[in-house]
């Protein structure tokens, strides 16, 4: 999944103050909520960093392994799925 696509959908989730579910290899799911979480994408490394403000912990995910990102908009789920 491209870093640009990841940024677009996570920016939209942030703008709408909604959750984003990030699925990694169909086994692991990260729920980035509107409160207490932040993220950044390192384009040059193709890595997504998820930051939990409460625990002050960072999780790094190679964007190659992200299989899907889903956000909720007006009671509908919208997904970005890796081809």
Q: Would you name each region that the model predicts?
A:
Residues 1-28, 72-83:
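Short glycine-rich, low-complexity segments
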């Amino acid at each position: 999944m491209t870093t640009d696509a990841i940024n677009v959908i996570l920016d939209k989730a942030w703008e709408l103050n909604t959750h984003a579910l990030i699925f990694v290899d169909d086994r692991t799911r990260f729920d980035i909520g509107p409160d207490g979480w932040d993220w950044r994408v390192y384009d040059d490394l193709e890595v997504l960093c998820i930051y939990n403000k409460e625990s002050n912990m960072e999780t790094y995910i190679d964007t190659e392994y992200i299989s899907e990102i889903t956000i909720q908009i007006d009671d509908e789920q919208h997904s970005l799925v890796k081809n």
